[in-house]
């Protein structure tokens, strides 16, 4: 019983530390050359199939330079398709062109969550650059 209690306390401490770390991460950072990096972890909680799908979005001069998927709990088999087939389509697009990218068949929920995260990143960028 005592071991179970200690394990529960350790679990709670881990969750509390993770939440504190989330709060410390800046949503947007400005780099040299007018490059902005937006972390959508706290901006958008739209779930894919299993979990939120946060992104790190790099924007320069109102164009997406790159999009990187951050850790999530999506099914690896399906999310691999997202990272290999969908996410690369956004690089080089103007912000207003992102909505035109179609979701992937067979991974629609995750695709839509990625697009929602991109939209949240765009809105934050426009409001705070």
Protein language model features and the residues they cover:
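Positively charged n-region of N-terminal signal peptides that target proteins for export
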Residues: 1-4
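Flexible, solvent-exposed loop/hinge segments and secondary-structure transition points
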Residues: 19-112, 122-129
């Amino acid at each position: 019983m005592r071991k179970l209690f200690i394990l529960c306390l350790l679990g709670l401490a881990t969750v509390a530390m993770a939440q504190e770390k989330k709060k410390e991460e800046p949503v947007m950072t400005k780099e040299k050359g007018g490059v902005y990096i937006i972390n959508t972890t706290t901006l958008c909680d739209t779930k894919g199939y299993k979990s939120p799908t946060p992104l790190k979005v790099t924007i320069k001069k109102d164009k997406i330079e790159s999009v990187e998927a951050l850790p999530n709990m999506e099914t690896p088999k399906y999310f691999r398709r997202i990272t290999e087939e969908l996410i690369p389509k956004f690089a080089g697009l103007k912000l207003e062109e992102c909505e035109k990218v179609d979701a992937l068949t067979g991974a629609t929920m995750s695709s839509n969550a990625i697009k929602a995260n991109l939209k949240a990143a765009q809105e934050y960028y426009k409001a705070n650059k």
